[in-house]
Amino acid sequence: MSEVTTAEFNEEGKYLRKIRSFVLREGRLTKGQAQAIESQWPTMGLDYSPTPLVLSDVFGREADTVLEIGFGMGASLVQMAKDAPEQNFIGIEVHKPGVGSCLSDAAIAGVTNLRVYHHDAMEVLEHAIADGSLARVQLFFPDPWHKKRHHKRRIVQAEFAELIRRKLKIGGVFHMATDWEEYSEHMLEVMQAAPGYKNQSSDGTVVPRPDHRPLTKFEARGHRLGHGVWDLMFERIA
């Protein structure tokens, strides 16, 4: 069991301090997850270091790089890497069984263009990712912290938007998705106010699910039950 921290922001989105977001219970690794970590980490795992990655060294080539924050069990991330072999993918996840599951699926799929961090995403972004190096940042279904008193814990805040903008190259895209409509409205408000971005939606709101984001089983079930999912895509223009 380990403590996971997140940032706290004031009402203007100014960073205040790190606070404990939740206590992560690692859960038991399945035999397959443990074996995948042991066998695949040397080739697909990235050990955190507070110095920026040289992506061409990590992947052995120059290519657009997509980074996903909090990939869960990793099925969608592996599918994206498989569907776009011309791109590089980096996933960050603090839940160890999710890391094991992702590595297992990646090995089975035979993908070679995926690397994984088991670390705090804010630290990785701040220190291990060079400014202007990413073609896309993905944040899919983050915790909505739906109670008003917990809104300060939401990851999409003004300073976070600025951090992502710095890491994107000009023309790069910050892609968010949520199944909580009120959080999508919060995301839209934050991103519309963030300098250096342009909303890719034709009507200035949300976009249809793009082809590059796979439809998850959870999401497909939600559609059948009439639940919505909202995608937002903002391009770095400055």
Curated annotation (Swiss-Prot):
Top-level taxon of the source organism: Bacteria
Which pathway does it take part in?
A: tRNA modification; N(7)-methylguanine-tRNA biosynthesis
Origin organism is Shewanella baltica (strain OS223)
Does the record's keyword annotation contain Transmembrane helix? Answer: no
Q: What does this protein do?
A: Catalyzes the formation of N(7)-methylguanine at position 46 (m7G46) in tRNA.
Instruction: Output this protein's name.
Output: tRNA (guanine-N(7)-)-methyltransferase
Q: Which residues form the active site?
A: 143
Q: What is its EC number?
A: 2.1.1.33
Q: Name one GO molecular function term.
A: tRNA (guanine(46)-N7)-methyltransferase activity
